[in-house]
């Protein structure tokens, strides 16, 4: 009998073991769809990004008009740009839901998978930031100025570091060209990190909603979850195309329709919606270095999550107190996102400070505390 090429070919067998014959828990819910959705987001962003890069000019005098040219004169250029800009939003929606799933169901106990995931998140955030600068509108320019300036808070080397990043004494042409270089490079780095992320995941196999060992009841990935994933793709791509076609500027800032002008500061400098929670935490501390440290901590705190797991149960499925705390955290992040979009004035300042404090309190103190309490309740 001839050997099955799918199982014997060096390349095909890797694909087979990852996407076809992969043993998968039989009870994973739609919350497990977001990994593959992130893969589709990445593929879409790389494809649309390549097409945009073919028409883009990374020069301060030409960048803004080259983007306008793409939208006006290139076949379906407007659609490619709108898909790319809104695709970023969907990328972040998926990654935040994916992280939320990981938190709720204790997936972070696969430490290597979790840590590579956080590195992926940081790389994605860097990619989105440098990409936002490229159209060279007002918010692009001032966003770049404000965020890169944060590095000057680093003692002793800060100012040198910022000028080195800028390639001069302010955000200018060298900054734009290097940001374009980085924006082109980083998505491929994300693709590479994704393979590492999956390699670690397939070492242990997927977690499941019950948080129990599911080896005795696993099913092949294909056709069960391949079909389920395709349904997920459709449900992701439908709202993306709807947004890109009907309301492409809904999530953007009108300020970015004005070409960058170093002499005019926009009244409210704010990032895209997916960074607002971190921006609110940054602004809630009246000290520059303190704010920068809080900003970094708001994301890097995720590295500590596996160490703070005190419960005897892996998931929150049967832990109502932890569930309540989890949804409080979600509400808290929603409040932070809202505060980040508001001007720095009363009552937004105090709300932002309280929400920032609550964010760190829930993750660092209350989650381990409630976990320990629930363990005690199990004994009675």
Swiss-Prot record:
Keyword set, alphabetical order: Electron transport, Heme, Iron, Membrane, Metal-binding, Mitochondrion, Mitochondrion inner membrane, Respiratory chain, Transmembrane, Transmembrane helix, Transport, Ubiquinone
Keyword Transferase attributed: no
A biological process term (GO) from this entry: mitochondrial electron transport, ubiquinol to cytochrome c
Entry coiled-coil feature ranges: none
GO molecular function: metal ion binding; ubiquinol-cytochrome-c reductase activity
Residues noted as binding heme b b566 in the record, renumbered to the chain: 98, 197
Name the UniProt record assigns to this protein: Cytochrome b
Organism (species): Eudyptes chrysolophus
Taxonomic lineage from the root: Eukaryota, Metazoa, Chordata, Craniata, Vertebrata
Gene (name only): MT-CYB
